[in-house]
């Protein structure tokens, strides 16, 4: 018997694992089972600095401020200006998440590129503000709002999470413009994420793309069949 609630399927992995390419293929697979929507739920934290740089008058100055605060975040919260920029991106992500929930309420099968998590603060797809550090009252309040937002989003557990696991050398070769240290952290974190006990499928993303797509498609097919879709 087909499940009443449309499935929520997430694809996660480090940069260089091929998430976007896999999602582009999988949405065509998912659509065979019914009306579906692909939604990007990534925080896109790397875009914060690039977006700020484009702002008129103060863009470059703010970008430098954010970079300085990123180095200091282990010891204290950022200042008000970068904190507001971070909060604006959290609000943007919340809008996308609410759109995803609306799609489910409309009866659509949802495939997400990335998924928010509150399991590991500071990790990818998690909170930006560091926990349990000193800061001004206003920025501390913004940090608490971010934690609440991520806790709420993470409380909506996906039905299936496809993890694309990739080695550091492969990721670096695919993303030569990314910092090696950053990629290494993301790769190390991926196996630790459990998404509240969601069903997980691990895929070796070091393989040629064609085989990765075959494995991902099989994961979808097996899952949808078990949910009563044919």
From Swiss-Prot:
GO terms for molecular function: ATP binding; dTMP kinase activity. GO terms for biological process: dTDP biosynthetic process; dTTP biosynthetic process; dUDP biosynthetic process. It comes from the Bacteria. The keyword ATP-binding applies. Transmembrane segments: none annotated. GO terms for cellular component: cytoplasm; cytosol. ATP binds at residues 13-20. Keywords: ATP-binding, Nucleotide-binding. Gene3D superfamilies: P-loop containing nucleotide triphosphate hydrolases. InterPro entries: P-loop_NTPase (IPR027417). To E.coli YghR and YghS. PANTHER family: THYMIDYLATE KINASE, UMP-CMP KINASE 2, MITOCHONDRIAL. This is Uncharacterized ATP-binding protein YghT. It comes from Escherichia coli (strain K12). The lineage of its organism: Bacteria, Pseudomonadati, Pseudomonadota, Gammaproteobacteria, Enterobacterales. The gene is yghT.
């Amino acid at each position: 018997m087909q499940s009443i609630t449309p499935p929520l399927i997430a694809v996660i992995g480090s940069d260089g694992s091929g998430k976007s390419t896999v999602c582009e293929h999988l949405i065509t697979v998912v659509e065979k089972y019914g009306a579906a929507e692909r939604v990007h739920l990534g925080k896109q934290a790397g875009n914060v600095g690039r977006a700020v740089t484009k702002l008129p008058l103060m863009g470059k100055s703010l970008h430098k401020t954010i970079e300085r605060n990123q180095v200091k975040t282990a010891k204290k919260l950022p200042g008000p200006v970068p904190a507001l920029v971070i909060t604006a991106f959290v609000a943007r992500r919340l809008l996308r998440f609410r759109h995803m929930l609306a799609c489910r309420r409309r009866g659509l099968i949802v495939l997400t590129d990335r998924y928010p998590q509150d399991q590991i603060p500071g990790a990818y797809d998690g909170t930006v503000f560091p926990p349990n550090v000193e800061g001004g009252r206003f920025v501390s309040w913004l940090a608490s709002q971010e934690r609440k937002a991520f806790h709420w989003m993470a409380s909506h557990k996906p039905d299936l999470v496809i993890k694309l696991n990739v080695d550091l050398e492969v990721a670096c070769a695919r993303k030569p413009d990314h910092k090696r240290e950053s990629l290494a952290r993301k790769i190390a974190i991926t196996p630790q994420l459990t998404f509240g006990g969601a069903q997980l499928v691990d895929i070796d993303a070091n393989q040629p793309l064609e085989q990765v797509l075959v494995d991902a498609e099989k994961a979808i097919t097996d899952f949808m069949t078990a949910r009563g879709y044919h």
